[in-house]
Amino acid sequence: MDRAQKEQVVEELGQIFDASGVVVVARYEGMTVAEMQDLRAQMRDAGGSVRVAKNRLAKIALDGKPCASIADYLTGMTVLAFSDDPVAAAKVADKYAKGNDKFVILGGAMGDTALDPAGVKAVAQMPSREELIASIVACIGAPASNIAGAIGAPASNIAGILATLEEREAA
């Protein structure tokens, strides 16, 4: 890899570190190509990406970035998992690590907050942005549906009583 290619890699990684909501660093030593492709596919489905880069170039790209705290984890065979959604990459990495002993989470960063492996696991257990929005909408909509039910209930009760009275008169 010549100098121009290295500069391009550093630039790309810098853009990734700036744009990502979360970055997870993991060791992938011993993983097969098929396993790595499976990880990439799962991450892509969740809206994230996986990138293998030279640690030295990644450390240069981290200089001055909010997630610079992950530089300490960049030793050995490491892979970077990242996503715009603050929890997507952590969720996929945590799930994949549970099913594959060769994939070991070393740590990560969420913005300027450093995460150890337990921190990445905690982020992975958080609900996603879509799940949070759905629960907020449900909370907002619940009072309205309760009011509609309360308003409609007396009318249905009266209709039931009238139907019962009609049946008694007919009998």
Swiss-Prot record:
GO terms for molecular function: large ribosomal subunit rRNA binding; structural constituent of ribosome. Keywords: Ribonucleoprotein, Ribosomal protein, RNA-binding, rRNA-binding. GO terms for biological process: translation. One of its GO terms (cellular component) is large ribosomal subunit. It comes from the Bacteria. InterPro entries: Ribosomal_uL10, Ribosomal_uL10-like_sf, Ribosomal_uL10_bac, Ribosomal_uL10_bac_type, Ribosomal_uL10_CS_bac. It holds the Pfam family Ribosomal_L10. SUPFAM superfamilies: Ribosomal protein L10-like. The keyword Acetylation does not apply. Part of the ribosomal stalk of the 50S ribosomal subunit. The N-terminus interacts with L11 and the large rRNA to form the base of the stalk. The C-terminus forms an elongated spine to which L12 dimers bind in a sequential fashion forming a multimeric L10(L12)X complex. Forms part of the ribosomal stalk, playing a central role in the interaction of the ribosome with GTP-bound translation factors. Belongs to the universal ribosomal protein uL10 family. This is Large ribosomal subunit protein uL10. It comes from Paracoccus denitrificans (strain Pd 1222).
